Amino acid sequence: MNDMAVRVRFCPSPTGTPHVGLIRTALFNWAYARHTGGTFVFRIEDTDSARDSEESYQAILDALNWLGLDYDEGPEIGGPYAPYRQSQRRDLYRDVIDRLIAAGEAYEAYSTAEEVEARHLAAGRNPKLGYDNFDRDLTDEQRAAHRAEGRNPVIRLRMPERDITWRDLVRGETTFGAGTMPDFALTRGNGEPLYTLVNPVDDALMKITHVLRGEDLLPSTPRQIALYEALIRIGVADGVPEFAHLPSVLGDGNKKLSKRDPQSNLFLHRDRGFIPEGLLNYLALLGWGIADDRDVFSLDEMVAAFDVVDVNSNPARFDQKKADALNAEHIRLLSEDEFTARLKAYFAAHGHDTGLDDAQFAEAARLVQTRIVVLGDAWGLLKFLDEGAFVLDEKAAAKELKADAVPVLDAALAGLEGVGQWTTGAIEEALKKALLEDLELKPRKAFGPIRVAATGASVSPPLFESLELLGRDRSLARLRAGRDHAAAAA
C-alpha cells in the first residue's frame, strides 16, 4: 500500500471519559495525515451495546473539537465510506462473513469451551491453551447434527500454518511463529460480529493505508494480517496496511497509565486550565520529539516534522510537572488579546466573576499571564477583586499583619488618601514616598502588609496595578480593615 495516498483512522469505542493515551493516538494519526497530505478518518466502534454510550461519544467529539484535531471523514460529516459508526454497518459485516465462509476462509465452529478443555486434557495438554481448531473439517452431516441439537456456531477464520511477519514502522520486523495463533472467532454464537472482524473489515473497506495504534493491540496484529490476506483473496481488501504500534504511556511507578489514574482524564486537565497547545505539545512528547534540544513547539511545527518512523518504541512516562511547565510556556506564547479571551472564557465556564469591565479585565489578564501554569491559577491571583471570594489568608496575615504593620498601614492610608487620579503611577508614587522615603522602610517591609491587606494573600499580581484594579474605595477600606486586624493582633 506504499504507493497509495495516506489514509489513517482514529476509531475509539464510546466508553468512559477520553484518556490521554487515546488522545495521544488520535494526535499521532492526525499529525501523520496532515504531514503527508493524507486523510484522517474518524470512526466509532460501537458494537458493544452493553458498554457504549452516547454520552461517551459526545465526550470524544468534545475532546477532538477542543483540541482542534479536525477529521476529514466521520460520523458527523460523512464521507465516501459512510456510515462511520460500526453499529450502522452490520449488513456489510454479514456479507463479508458469508463470502469468507463460501470461499473456505472461515468456518462454523460448534465446540463449547468445556469440550475444548476436555480434548486438551485427554491429550495431556494445558486445558487453558485455547481453541484447538477441532471444527475446521467438520462434515456437512456433523454440522447439521450440531444444529439439530440447538447449538449456535461461532465463525472462525482459518489461520495459515506459517509464521506471520511484518515490518512495524515503530518496532521493526516482528514475527509470530506458526502454530502460536489458533483459528480465532469472528462472531459470537448469536451471529454478532466481533472486534476481530469489524476492525480490519472497516479498515479494508475504507482503504486505510496505515494503522497507528497502541502497543497493547500488538498481539492481535498477526490475526488481523491473516484476515486481511483472506479479504484480499475474496476481493474485499486491496492490501495489508502498514502497522505502527505506539509506546505505552506509564503512570506512577512502572504501571501503565489507567483510567483510574486522575492524570489520565483529558477533561481534568482542561478543567485545571490546560490550553490545547500545551497539552498537545506534551502528548506529542510521549513517544516523539521534534529535536533533542527542544521540547516546546507548535502544532504546525509538529505537522511539518512528524513521521511515524521517528516514534520511539520505549514506554513513555506521564510527568505532570513537565506537562504543567510546557503549558505555562504556551500560555506565555499567546498574544495578550488571545490570552485575555481564553481566560475570560475559562472564568465564565467556571463561574468566576472579577466584576471588571473589558478593559480592566484585559489589564488583569496581562498581569497574570506570566505568573501562572494553568488558567485555573489565575483565579487564585485575581479572586481578591470579587468581594464574595475575598478572604484573608491566616498564615499571610499572621506574618504581615502584626503590631509593627500598624504604622505602615497608617502611613499608606495617609499617602493614598491624597491621591487624585487613582492610577498605577500615582499609587506607586504615593506609597513609595510615604513608606520608602518618609519611613525609610525596605520594600518588603513596606509593601508586604499592604499586599496582604488588599489582596488577602502574600502572593498577588503586581501591587500597584492590583490597587488600581481594586479601585480607590475598596483599596482604602481593605487597608483600614488590615490596620484594624494588625492592631488587634498587637
Swiss-Prot record:
Which N-terminal residues, if any, form the signal peptide? none
Q: Which UniProt keywords apply?
A: Aminoacyl-tRNA synthetase, ATP-binding, Cytoplasm, Ligase, Nucleotide-binding, Protein biosynthesis
Which Pfam families does the entry link to?
Anticodon_2 (PF19269), tRNA-synt_1c (PF00749)
Q: Which GO terms describe its molecular function?
A: ATP binding; glutamate-tRNA ligase activity; tRNA binding; zinc ion binding
Gene Ontology biological process terms in this record: glutamyl-tRNA aminoacylation
CDD domains per UniProt:
GluRS_core
The lineage's top-level taxon is Bacteria
The question of whether Protein biosynthesis is a record keyword is answered with: yes
Enzyme class at the top of the EC tree: ligase
Q: Where is this motif: 'HIGH' region?
A: 12-22
Binding of ATP occurs at 259
Q: Which residues cross the membrane?
A: none
Q: Which reaction does it catalyse?
A: tRNA(Glu) + L-glutamate + ATP = L-glutamyl-tRNA(Glu) + AMP + diphosphate
Query: According to its record, what are the GO cellular component terms?
Result: cytosol
Location comes to: Cytoplasm
Q: At which positions is motif 'KMSKS' region? A: 256-260
Assembly and interaction partners: Monomer.
Matching entries from HAMAP family are given as: Glu_tRNA_synth_type1 (MF_00022)
What family does the database annotate? Answer: Belongs to the class-I aminoacyl-tRNA synthetase family. Glutamate--tRNA ligase type 1 subfamily.
- This chain belongs to the protein called Glutamate--tRNA ligase
Q: Which organism is it from?
A: Mycobacterium sp. (strain KMS)
Q: Which gene encodes it?
A: gltX
